[in-house]
Amino acid sequence: AARAAALEQRWLTHEALREIALAHQICPYYLSQELCRWADVVVCDYNYYFDMGGLLYGLTLLNEWRITLLVDEAHNLIERARGMYTAELNQQRFEAVRRIAPSVMKAPLERISRHWRQLERDQEVAYQVYPTAPDLFVMALQKAVSTLTDHLSEQPAGNASELLHFYLDAMLFCRLAEAFGAHSLFDISRDEGSGQSVSTLCIRNIVPAPFLAPRFDEAHSCTLFSATLSPANYYADLLGLPEETPWIDVESPFSAEQLHVQAVSNLSTRYAHRDYSLAPIAALIARQYAEKPGNYLAFFSSYTYLQAVLHELQMAHPQIPVWQQSRKMDEVERQAFLDRFSSTGRGIGFAVLGGAFGEGIDLPGDRLIGAFIATLGLPQINPVNEEIKQRMEVMFGSNNGYGYTYLYPGLQKVVQAAGRVIRTVKDQGVVYLIDDRFNQPAIRKLLPTWWKVERCRLPLNKDPVL
Protein backbone atom coordinates (compact mmCIF):
# COMPACT_ATOMS: atom_id res chain seq x y z
CA ALA A 1 0.00 0.00 0.00
CA ALA A 2 2.85 2.39 0.82
CA ARG A 3 4.50 1.60 -2.48
CA ALA A 4 1.29 2.24 -4.40
CA ALA A 5 0.73 5.54 -2.60
CA ALA A 6 4.27 6.64 -3.38
CA LEU A 7 4.05 5.69 -7.05
CA GLU A 8 1.05 7.98 -7.44
CA GLN A 9 3.46 10.88 -6.88
CA ARG A 10 5.33 11.74 -10.07
CA TRP A 11 7.87 13.86 -8.17
CA LEU A 12 8.56 12.17 -4.84
CA THR A 13 10.28 14.61 -2.49
CA HIS A 14 11.97 13.65 0.76
CA GLU A 15 9.13 15.15 2.78
CA ALA A 16 6.40 13.40 0.77
CA LEU A 17 8.13 10.03 1.03
CA ARG A 18 8.57 10.41 4.77
CA GLU A 19 4.88 11.23 5.26
CA ILE A 20 3.82 8.15 3.26
CA ALA A 21 6.22 5.87 5.15
CA LEU A 22 5.11 7.07 8.57
CA ALA A 23 1.45 6.78 7.59
CA HIS A 24 2.05 3.10 6.80
CA GLN A 25 4.40 2.58 9.78
CA ILE A 26 7.44 1.55 7.75
CA CYS A 27 11.00 2.88 7.52
CA PRO A 28 11.33 5.84 5.10
CA TYR A 29 14.85 4.78 4.12
CA TYR A 30 13.86 1.27 3.04
CA LEU A 31 10.75 2.53 1.28
CA SER A 32 12.92 4.91 -0.74
CA GLN A 33 15.26 2.07 -1.71
CA GLU A 34 12.33 -0.11 -2.74
CA LEU A 35 10.92 2.67 -4.92
CA CYS A 36 14.18 2.94 -6.85
CA ARG A 37 12.99 -0.08 -8.86
CA TRP A 38 10.40 2.15 -10.57
CA ALA A 39 12.32 5.42 -10.75
CA ASP A 40 13.91 6.78 -13.91
CA VAL A 41 16.06 9.28 -11.99
CA VAL A 42 17.28 8.99 -8.39
CA VAL A 43 18.82 12.07 -6.76
CA CYS A 44 20.73 11.17 -3.62
CA ASP A 45 23.83 11.66 -1.51
CA TYR A 46 27.07 9.85 -2.42
CA ASN A 47 26.73 7.31 0.37
CA TYR A 48 23.62 5.66 -1.10
CA TYR A 49 25.76 4.18 -3.86
CA PHE A 50 29.41 4.50 -2.82
CA ASP A 51 29.23 3.55 0.86
CA MET A 52 30.10 -0.01 1.88
CA GLY A 53 26.52 -0.44 3.09
CA GLY A 54 24.89 1.58 0.32
CA LEU A 55 21.73 -0.21 -0.80
CA LEU A 56 21.66 1.31 -4.29
CA TYR A 57 24.87 -0.48 -5.22
CA GLY A 58 23.52 -3.75 -3.84
CA LEU A 59 20.26 -3.33 -5.76
CA THR A 60 22.22 -2.57 -8.93
CA LEU A 61 24.06 -5.88 -8.60
CA LEU A 62 20.98 -7.85 -7.57
CA ASN A 63 18.76 -6.57 -10.37
CA GLU A 64 21.53 -6.27 -12.98
CA TRP A 65 20.52 -2.68 -13.64
CA ARG A 66 22.13 -0.74 -16.48
CA ILE A 67 22.75 2.51 -14.65
CA THR A 68 24.30 5.87 -15.46
CA LEU A 69 26.02 7.79 -12.68
CA LEU A 70 26.22 11.58 -12.59
CA VAL A 71 28.55 12.64 -9.77
CA ASP A 72 28.20 16.32 -8.93
CA GLU A 73 30.92 18.26 -7.06
CA ALA A 74 33.14 15.24 -7.61
CA HIS A 75 36.14 16.92 -5.96
CA ASN A 76 34.44 16.12 -2.64
CA LEU A 77 34.27 12.39 -3.30
CA ILE A 78 37.82 11.68 -2.11
CA GLU A 79 37.26 12.95 1.42
CA ARG A 80 33.71 11.61 1.58
CA ALA A 81 34.83 8.16 0.48
CA ARG A 82 37.71 8.16 2.93
CA GLY A 83 35.16 8.74 5.65
CA MET A 84 32.95 5.91 4.38
CA TYR A 85 35.82 3.43 4.56
CA THR A 86 37.24 4.56 7.89
CA ALA A 87 36.24 3.06 11.24
CA GLU A 88 37.04 4.29 14.75
CA LEU A 89 36.61 2.78 18.19
CA ASN A 90 36.94 5.18 21.12
CA GLN A 91 37.93 3.74 24.48
CA GLN A 92 35.82 6.13 26.54
CA ARG A 93 32.66 5.32 24.59
CA PHE A 94 33.51 1.61 24.71
CA GLU A 95 33.78 1.67 28.52
CA ALA A 96 30.42 3.44 28.69
CA VAL A 97 28.90 0.60 26.63
CA ARG A 98 30.45 -2.00 28.95
CA ARG A 99 28.71 -0.43 31.93
CA ILE A 100 25.22 -0.68 30.39
CA ALA A 101 25.63 -3.86 28.32
CA PRO A 102 23.31 -6.83 28.96
CA SER A 103 24.80 -9.73 30.91
CA VAL A 104 25.26 -11.86 27.79
CA MET A 105 27.75 -9.25 26.52
CA LYS A 106 29.89 -8.98 29.66
CA ALA A 107 32.41 -11.69 28.76
CA PRO A 108 32.86 -10.71 25.06
CA LEU A 109 33.34 -7.06 25.99
CA GLU A 110 35.79 -7.94 28.77
CA ARG A 111 37.84 -9.89 26.21
CA ILE A 112 37.96 -6.80 23.97
CA SER A 113 38.95 -4.63 26.93
CA ARG A 114 41.77 -6.98 27.88
CA HIS A 115 43.31 -6.87 24.39
CA TRP A 116 42.77 -3.10 24.23
CA ARG A 117 44.68 -2.58 27.50
CA GLN A 118 47.54 -4.67 26.14
CA LEU A 119 47.74 -2.47 23.05
CA GLU A 120 47.93 0.55 25.34
CA ARG A 121 50.76 -0.96 27.36
CA ASP A 122 52.72 -1.73 24.20
CA GLN A 123 52.40 1.79 22.79
CA GLU A 124 55.11 4.22 23.91
CA VAL A 125 54.07 7.35 21.98
CA ALA A 126 50.86 9.35 21.64
CA TYR A 127 50.32 8.41 17.98
CA GLN A 128 51.53 5.25 16.29
CA VAL A 129 50.85 3.47 13.01
CA TYR A 130 50.90 -0.33 12.86
CA PRO A 131 51.33 -2.67 9.87
CA THR A 132 47.83 -4.07 10.34
CA ALA A 133 44.98 -4.30 12.83
CA PRO A 134 46.02 -6.74 15.62
CA ASP A 135 44.54 -10.19 15.02
CA LEU A 136 43.64 -10.98 18.64
CA PHE A 137 41.78 -7.71 19.07
CA VAL A 138 39.88 -8.15 15.81
CA MET A 139 38.95 -11.73 16.72
CA ALA A 140 37.61 -10.56 20.08
CA LEU A 141 35.63 -7.82 18.34
CA GLN A 142 34.19 -10.29 15.82
CA LYS A 143 33.08 -12.57 18.67
CA ALA A 144 31.37 -9.64 20.39
CA VAL A 145 29.59 -8.66 17.17
CA SER A 146 28.34 -12.22 16.73
CA THR A 147 27.04 -12.38 20.30
CA LEU A 148 25.42 -8.96 20.01
CA THR A 149 23.77 -9.95 16.71
CA ASP A 150 22.13 -12.93 18.45
CA HIS A 151 21.04 -10.73 21.35
CA LEU A 152 19.46 -8.12 19.08
CA SER A 153 17.64 -10.84 17.12
CA GLU A 154 16.12 -12.20 20.32
CA GLN A 155 15.50 -8.79 21.91
CA PRO A 156 15.17 -6.17 19.13
CA ALA A 157 13.49 -3.54 21.33
CA GLY A 158 14.58 -1.70 24.44
CA ASN A 159 18.31 -1.60 23.72
CA ALA A 160 20.32 1.50 24.63
CA SER A 161 21.35 3.74 21.75
CA GLU A 162 24.99 3.52 22.91
CA LEU A 163 24.89 -0.25 22.46
CA LEU A 164 23.43 0.06 18.96
CA HIS A 165 26.04 2.66 17.94
CA PHE A 166 28.80 0.36 19.19
CA TYR A 167 27.29 -2.51 17.21
CA LEU A 168 27.39 -0.55 13.96
CA ASP A 169 30.90 0.80 14.63
CA ALA A 170 32.21 -2.64 15.52
CA MET A 171 30.69 -4.28 12.43
CA LEU A 172 32.28 -1.68 10.18
CA PHE A 173 35.62 -2.05 11.95
CA CYS A 174 35.54 -5.83 11.43
CA ARG A 175 34.60 -5.53 7.76
CA LEU A 176 37.38 -3.03 7.11
CA ALA A 177 39.87 -5.17 9.03
CA GLU A 178 39.07 -8.03 6.64
CA ALA A 179 39.60 -5.73 3.64
CA PHE A 180 42.73 -4.08 5.09
CA GLY A 181 45.50 -3.22 2.63
CA ALA A 182 47.95 -0.56 1.51
CA HIS A 183 44.98 1.74 0.88
CA SER A 184 44.50 2.20 4.64
CA LEU A 185 46.38 2.79 7.89
CA PHE A 186 45.78 1.24 11.28
CA ASP A 187 46.73 3.72 13.96
CA ILE A 188 46.22 4.29 17.66
CA SER A 189 45.94 7.79 19.11
CA ARG A 190 46.30 8.33 22.84
CA ASP A 191 44.82 11.40 24.54
CA GLU A 192 45.98 12.19 28.07
CA GLY A 193 44.56 15.71 28.23
CA SER A 194 41.73 14.78 30.62
CA GLY A 195 44.11 13.40 33.25
CA GLN A 196 43.62 9.80 32.16
CA SER A 197 44.80 7.97 29.10
CA VAL A 198 42.08 7.42 26.49
CA SER A 199 42.94 5.81 23.19
CA THR A 200 41.21 5.64 19.82
CA LEU A 201 41.76 2.75 17.42
CA CYS A 202 41.32 3.69 13.78
CA ILE A 203 41.33 1.89 10.45
CA ARG A 204 41.91 5.01 8.39
CA ASN A 205 41.29 4.87 4.67
CA ILE A 206 43.54 7.19 2.67
CA VAL A 207 43.11 5.81 -0.87
CA PRO A 208 39.45 4.91 -1.53
CA ALA A 209 40.20 3.72 -5.08
CA PRO A 210 39.98 -0.05 -4.35
CA PHE A 211 36.52 0.42 -2.86
CA LEU A 212 35.18 2.86 -5.45
CA ALA A 213 36.55 1.25 -8.62
CA PRO A 214 34.07 -1.70 -8.59
CA ARG A 215 31.22 0.76 -8.23
CA PHE A 216 32.40 2.76 -11.23
CA ASP A 217 32.89 -0.47 -13.20
CA GLU A 218 29.35 -1.62 -12.47
CA ALA A 219 27.86 1.51 -14.04
CA HIS A 220 27.12 1.55 -17.76
CA SER A 221 28.51 5.08 -17.82
CA CYS A 222 29.71 7.57 -15.26
CA THR A 223 30.30 11.30 -15.50
CA LEU A 224 32.07 13.19 -12.74
CA PHE A 225 31.99 16.96 -12.89
CA SER A 226 33.37 19.83 -10.86
CA ALA A 227 35.16 23.13 -11.33
CA THR A 228 38.14 21.71 -9.42
CA LEU A 229 39.16 18.34 -10.87
CA SER A 230 42.78 19.23 -11.48
CA PRO A 231 45.29 17.67 -11.73
CA ALA A 232 43.71 14.65 -13.35
CA ASN A 233 46.23 12.10 -12.04
CA TYR A 234 45.41 13.02 -8.43
CA TYR A 235 41.71 12.28 -8.83
CA ALA A 236 42.24 9.26 -11.08
CA ASP A 237 44.65 7.64 -8.62
CA LEU A 238 42.64 8.24 -5.47
CA LEU A 239 39.17 7.57 -6.93
CA GLY A 240 40.18 4.51 -8.93
CA LEU A 241 39.01 5.78 -12.30
CA PRO A 242 39.71 3.53 -15.31
CA GLU A 243 42.88 4.32 -17.26
CA GLU A 244 40.88 5.05 -20.41
CA THR A 245 38.76 7.71 -18.66
CA PRO A 246 38.52 10.79 -20.93
CA TRP A 247 39.02 14.20 -19.34
CA ILE A 248 37.21 17.21 -20.76
CA ASP A 249 38.10 20.75 -19.73
CA VAL A 250 34.93 22.66 -20.57
CA GLU A 251 35.51 26.31 -21.38
CA SER A 252 34.31 28.58 -18.60
CA PRO A 253 31.24 30.71 -19.34
CA PHE A 254 33.02 33.53 -17.50
CA SER A 255 35.77 35.79 -18.82
CA ALA A 256 38.94 37.14 -17.22
CA GLU A 257 37.48 40.64 -17.49
CA GLN A 258 34.76 39.70 -15.01
CA LEU A 259 37.13 38.68 -12.21
CA HIS A 260 40.11 40.77 -11.21
CA VAL A 261 42.50 38.29 -9.53
CA GLN A 262 45.50 39.70 -7.68
CA ALA A 263 48.21 37.62 -5.99
CA VAL A 264 50.08 39.38 -3.19
CA SER A 265 53.79 38.73 -3.69
CA ASN A 266 55.39 40.24 -0.58
CA LEU A 267 53.43 38.77 2.33
CA SER A 268 53.52 35.32 3.92
CA THR A 269 50.64 33.68 5.78
CA ARG A 270 52.82 30.83 7.03
CA TYR A 271 52.29 30.11 10.70
CA ALA A 272 55.62 31.67 11.72
CA HIS A 273 54.75 34.93 9.93
CA ARG A 274 51.10 35.34 10.87
CA ASP A 275 51.49 38.00 13.55
CA TYR A 276 53.33 40.16 11.04
CA SER A 277 50.62 39.62 8.42
CA LEU A 278 47.67 40.87 10.50
CA ALA A 279 48.01 44.61 9.95
CA PRO A 280 48.79 44.42 6.19
CA ILE A 281 45.80 42.14 5.55
CA ALA A 282 43.47 44.38 7.55
CA ALA A 283 44.79 47.41 5.64
CA LEU A 284 44.23 45.66 2.30
CA ILE A 285 40.65 44.78 3.21
CA ALA A 286 39.96 48.35 4.33
CA ARG A 287 41.52 49.85 1.20
CA GLN A 288 39.52 47.64 -1.17
CA TYR A 289 36.31 48.32 0.76
CA ALA A 290 36.94 52.08 0.59
CA GLU A 291 37.55 51.91 -3.16
CA LYS A 292 34.40 49.90 -3.77
CA PRO A 293 31.99 49.45 -0.87
CA GLY A 294 29.96 46.26 -1.03
CA ASN A 295 29.84 42.72 0.29
CA TYR A 296 33.07 40.73 0.60
CA LEU A 297 34.14 37.38 2.04
CA ALA A 298 37.49 37.04 3.81
CA PHE A 299 38.80 33.48 4.21
CA PHE A 300 41.41 32.28 6.69
CA SER A 301 42.99 28.96 7.59
CA SER A 302 41.69 28.86 11.18
CA TYR A 303 39.34 30.57 13.60
CA THR A 304 42.34 31.90 15.53
CA TYR A 305 43.79 33.58 12.44
CA LEU A 306 40.34 34.86 11.43
CA GLN A 307 39.72 36.46 14.81
CA ALA A 308 43.18 38.04 14.91
CA VAL A 309 42.69 39.81 11.56
CA LEU A 310 39.11 40.72 12.46
CA HIS A 311 40.33 42.33 15.69
CA GLU A 312 43.00 44.27 13.77
CA LEU A 313 40.42 45.52 11.26
CA GLN A 314 37.94 46.56 13.94
CA MET A 315 40.59 48.44 15.88
CA ALA A 316 41.92 50.33 12.85
CA HIS A 317 38.68 50.71 10.86
CA PRO A 318 35.67 50.43 13.19
CA GLN A 319 33.38 51.99 10.58
CA ILE A 320 33.48 48.89 8.34
CA PRO A 321 30.59 46.46 9.07
CA VAL A 322 31.83 42.93 9.80
CA TRP A 323 30.35 39.57 10.75
CA GLN A 324 32.03 36.24 11.32
CA GLN A 325 31.59 32.51 11.09
CA SER A 326 31.68 30.84 14.50
CA ARG A 327 32.40 27.30 15.54
CA LYS A 328 29.54 24.79 15.32
CA MET A 329 27.01 27.13 13.72
CA ASP A 330 23.57 25.56 13.38
CA GLU A 331 21.41 25.92 10.28
CA VAL A 332 19.67 29.06 11.56
CA GLU A 333 23.00 30.73 12.35
CA ARG A 334 24.44 29.81 8.96
CA GLN A 335 21.42 31.28 7.21
CA ALA A 336 21.70 34.46 9.28
CA PHE A 337 25.33 34.78 8.17
CA LEU A 338 24.32 34.45 4.51
CA ASP A 339 21.38 36.84 4.89
CA ARG A 340 23.84 39.63 5.63
CA PHE A 341 24.91 39.40 1.98
CA SER A 342 21.95 41.32 0.57
CA SER A 343 22.10 43.22 -2.71
CA THR A 344 21.91 46.49 -0.77
CA GLY A 345 24.19 45.36 2.05
CA ARG A 346 27.74 46.42 2.85
CA GLY A 347 30.47 44.75 4.86
CA ILE A 348 32.96 41.92 5.26
CA GLY A 349 32.01 38.39 6.21
CA PHE A 350 34.87 36.50 7.86
CA ALA A 351 34.96 32.73 7.28
CA VAL A 352 37.23 29.71 7.56
CA LEU A 353 38.45 28.26 4.27
CA GLY A 354 37.01 24.81 3.64
CA GLY A 355 34.06 25.45 5.94
CA ALA A 356 30.36 25.97 5.31
CA PHE A 357 30.83 29.16 3.29
CA GLY A 358 33.78 28.14 1.10
CA GLU A 359 31.61 26.28 -1.43
CA GLY A 360 28.02 25.39 -2.19
CA ILE A 361 26.65 28.89 -1.59
CA ASP A 362 25.25 31.14 -4.32
CA LEU A 363 25.54 34.92 -3.89
CA PRO A 364 25.06 36.41 -7.37
CA GLY A 365 25.25 40.04 -8.43
CA ASP A 366 25.86 42.60 -5.72
CA ARG A 367 25.32 40.08 -2.95
CA LEU A 368 29.07 39.34 -3.19
CA ILE A 369 31.61 41.42 -5.12
CA GLY A 370 34.91 40.16 -3.79
CA ALA A 371 36.93 37.74 -1.69
CA PHE A 372 40.18 37.84 0.25
CA ILE A 373 41.87 34.44 0.63
CA ALA A 374 44.68 34.64 3.17
CA THR A 375 45.93 31.06 2.98
CA LEU A 376 46.85 28.29 0.57
CA GLY A 377 44.43 26.07 2.46
CA LEU A 378 47.10 23.45 3.12
CA PRO A 379 46.09 20.76 5.63
CA GLN A 380 47.82 20.95 8.98
CA ILE A 381 51.19 19.24 9.27
CA ASN A 382 50.62 16.59 11.93
CA PRO A 383 51.52 12.92 12.48
CA VAL A 384 48.46 11.63 10.60
CA ASN A 385 49.05 13.75 7.50
CA GLU A 386 52.76 12.96 7.53
CA GLU A 387 51.91 9.23 7.55
CA ILE A 388 49.51 9.83 4.64
CA LYS A 389 52.26 11.68 2.78
CA GLN A 390 54.66 8.77 3.22
CA ARG A 391 52.06 6.26 2.02
CA MET A 392 51.29 8.43 -1.03
CA GLU A 393 54.99 8.47 -1.90
CA VAL A 394 55.14 4.68 -1.68
CA MET A 395 52.00 4.14 -3.78
CA PHE A 396 52.25 6.94 -6.34
CA GLY A 397 55.88 8.05 -6.37
CA SER A 398 58.03 10.29 -4.20
CA ASN A 399 57.19 13.34 -6.32
CA ASN A 400 53.48 13.03 -5.48
CA GLY A 401 53.54 12.76 -1.68
CA TYR A 402 53.36 16.47 -0.89
CA GLY A 403 50.95 17.30 -3.71
CA TYR A 404 48.49 14.50 -2.96
CA THR A 405 48.50 15.18 0.80
CA TYR A 406 48.80 18.93 1.09
CA LEU A 407 48.95 21.02 -2.08
CA TYR A 408 46.07 19.74 -4.21
CA PRO A 409 43.50 19.50 -1.38
CA GLY A 410 44.48 23.00 -0.26
CA LEU A 411 44.24 24.70 -3.64
CA GLN A 412 40.96 22.94 -4.32
CA LYS A 413 39.50 24.85 -1.36
CA VAL A 414 41.05 28.12 -2.58
CA VAL A 415 39.50 27.81 -6.05
CA GLN A 416 36.13 26.81 -4.62
CA ALA A 417 36.13 29.83 -2.30
CA ALA A 418 37.11 32.21 -5.12
CA GLY A 419 34.30 30.70 -7.18
CA ARG A 420 31.72 32.25 -4.83
CA VAL A 421 32.39 35.68 -6.39
CA ILE A 422 31.35 35.17 -10.02
CA ARG A 423 28.07 33.28 -10.33
CA THR A 424 26.57 34.66 -13.58
CA VAL A 425 27.88 36.07 -16.86
CA LYS A 426 26.86 39.54 -15.65
CA ASP A 427 28.78 39.47 -12.36
CA GLN A 428 31.93 41.50 -11.72
CA GLY A 429 34.29 41.03 -8.81
CA VAL A 430 37.76 40.90 -7.32
CA VAL A 431 39.76 38.17 -5.59
CA TYR A 432 42.93 38.72 -3.57
CA LEU A 433 45.18 35.68 -3.12
CA ILE A 434 47.21 36.67 -0.08
CA ASP A 435 50.46 34.72 0.17
CA ASP A 436 53.74 34.99 -1.71
CA ARG A 437 53.49 31.31 -2.71
CA PHE A 438 50.59 32.10 -5.06
CA ASN A 439 53.23 33.57 -7.38
CA GLN A 440 55.16 30.30 -7.70
CA PRO A 441 54.82 28.70 -11.17
CA ALA A 442 53.87 25.32 -9.66
CA ILE A 443 50.97 26.98 -7.83
CA ARG A 444 49.88 29.19 -10.72
CA LYS A 445 49.43 26.25 -13.10
CA LEU A 446 46.89 24.72 -10.71
CA LEU A 447 44.63 27.78 -10.81
CA PRO A 448 41.77 28.05 -13.34
CA THR A 449 43.02 28.72 -16.86
CA TRP A 450 40.49 31.52 -17.44
CA TRP A 451 41.89 33.57 -14.56
CA LYS A 452 44.31 36.36 -15.44
CA VAL A 453 46.31 36.59 -12.23
CA GLU A 454 48.13 39.86 -11.61
CA ARG A 455 51.01 40.20 -9.20
CA CYS A 456 50.67 42.94 -6.57
CA ARG A 457 52.68 44.22 -3.61
CA LEU A 458 51.33 45.60 -0.37
CA PRO A 459 52.78 48.68 1.33
CA LEU A 460 54.63 47.32 4.37
CA ASN A 461 56.36 49.03 7.28
CA LYS A 462 59.33 46.70 6.90
CA ASP A 463 60.39 43.90 4.62
CA PRO A 464 58.83 40.58 5.63
CA VAL A 465 60.90 37.51 6.32
CA LEU A 466 60.02 35.10 3.49
Region spans (language model):
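ASCE RecA-like P-loop NTPase motor cores
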Residues: 1-466
